[in-house]
Amino acid sequence: MFGRVAVLLGGTSAEREVSLLSGRNVLEVLRMRGVDAQSVDGVPALAQALVERRFDRVFNVLHGHNGGGEDGVVQGLMQAFGVPYTGSDVLGSALSMDKVRTKQVWLALGLPTPRYASLSVCATAVEVRKAVEMLGFPVIIKPAKEGSSVGVSRVFALEHLEEAVALAARYEGELLMEQLIEGDELTVSILDEMALPSIRIVPQGQWYDYNAKYLAEDTQYVCPGLDDVAEAEIAQLALAAFHSVGCRGWGRVDVMRERGSGRFFLLEVNTAPGMTTHSLVPKAASQLGMGFDDLVWRILEQTL
């Protein structure tokens, strides 16, 4: 049915460890179901493997950019070889990996997203200060092309600004300074053009950082995260956000709901979400009675 399947994992991005966990989980399911599945670690290895091992399709769980699988580079490689693959194509992957350009598309279409300023990694102290004055505290500072909360800081006062900028500047590309929306953090998974039930994330610490996402055992996940009326609203918004940047197949849209007003604000799109025991897409799918094995199968079926 599927032929020989490459499970693309690992790579050299800042999200390598998460990708390895995701890939091993996917690989285990496929092999258990009798699929001839083999792991391939990173983009250079995939280029060689497509020639030597003649894979029929690729299950992409390579996270991040610059050695990852969410920036359009690996999608272009697979298209050049004519090999079907899971997830978004070149355009959708490249655009959604860039948080600044994604926000520009959303704003042009009238979709709600927090106010922001983009900064180069060489931005002067004066430029950084001007951005803060425009947005007002509190702000979030993050690399524009990383995921998994890598390099992200919440800043509430001027004295912590320099440290936050320095942390984000360790990574390639622009920096994104964004208005911090206080309220509930939610995520909506997309599968086969359908929005799955939202998940409201309740970390035990101050916010949903890398530790809360992948290491902590006390982070709470409420699914569905909203009442029926709000669920319908956030589902429509997430699908619009997903399609507006050219995404397809499966993915995840992260959203904040402002405390008090109840307004939704789009944060980012993930085109190759995690598939670990802590990951959110499997949690949302399970709410509909879909186990992890069936979820993996549904995603791979998109390549047929």
Curated annotation (Swiss-Prot):
This protein's UniProt keywords: ATP-binding, Cell shape, Cell wall biogenesis/degradation, Cytoplasm, Ligase, Magnesium, Manganese, Metal-binding, Nucleotide-binding, Peptidoglycan synthesis
EC number: 6.3.2.4
A Gene Ontology molecular function term of the record: metal ion binding
Entry-linked Gene3D superfamilies: 3.40.50.20, ATP-grasp fold, A domain, ATP-grasp fold, B domain
Protein purpose: Cell wall formation.
Stated family: Belongs to the D-alanine--D-alanine ligase family.
Database matches in PANTHER family: D-ALANINE--D-ALANINE LIGASE, D-ALANINE--D-ALANINE LIGASE B
UniProt name for this protein: D-alanine--D-alanine ligase
Organism: Xylella fastidiosa (strain Temecula1 / ATCC 700964)
